[in-house]
């Protein structure tokens, strides 16, 4: 099931040929997002493939940078779906403040920042330069939940 959106950001999604997936339910004991004041915190999102399974593997071992970028992009799509679920209108996003990108990495893999570009590029395409340009942290980790290749969370500033 895909999400229906309206407004400027929805027009960008349509122009880009992107259909948001349904926002994923939390896998364990947490919530998918928290609105606090003028901030939205989106919990870590895993990369879903076209059939709803998790994109798994380790960068530098079983996955290439290009495959990692695709996984990061899939995570970012889930982040945007959570924003839509939380806000109802993606035009309420004033600024994507920060993305944290966790990359399942072999000990010798050092290209986490290139993998994270998959998420950053998607956010910039959807929200545009003024709203979508964000700070970012790209971190290599030994493992992620369910063997996921990448996990992305976000901090978003909201309009009134």
From Swiss-Prot:
Please, which domain of life does this record's source organism belong to?
Eukaryota
Keyword Zinc-finger listed: no
The main location is cytoplasm
Gene Ontology CC, one term: cytoplasm
Keywords (alphabetical) are:
Cytoplasm
Localisation = Cytoplasm
Keyword Disulfide bond attributed: no
Question: What Gene3D superfamilies does its record include?
Answer: RutC-like (3.30.1330.40)
Give the protein's recorded name. Protein TCP17
Species source reads Trypanosoma cruzi
Primary gene name: TCP17
């Amino acid at each position: 099931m895909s999400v229906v959106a309206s407004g400027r950001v929805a027009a960008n999604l349509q122009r880009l040929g992107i259909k948001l997936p349904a926002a994923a339910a939390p896998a364990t004991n947490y919530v998918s997002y928290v609105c606090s004041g003028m901030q939205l915190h989106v919990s870590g999102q895993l990369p879903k493939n076209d059939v709803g399974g998790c994109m798994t593997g380790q960068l530098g071992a079983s996955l290439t940078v290009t495959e990692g970028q695709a996984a990061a992009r899939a995570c970012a799509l889930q982040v945007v779906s959570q924003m839509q679920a939380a806000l109802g209108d993606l035009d309420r996003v004033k600024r994507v403040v920060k993305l944290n990108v966790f990359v399942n990495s072999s000990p010798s893999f050092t290209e986490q920042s290139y993998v994270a570009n998959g998420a950053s590029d998607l956010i910039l395409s959807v929200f545009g330069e003024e709203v979508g340009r964000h700070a970012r942290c790209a971190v290599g980790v030994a493992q992620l939940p369910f063997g996921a290749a990448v996990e992305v969370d976000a901090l978003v500033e909201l309009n009134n």
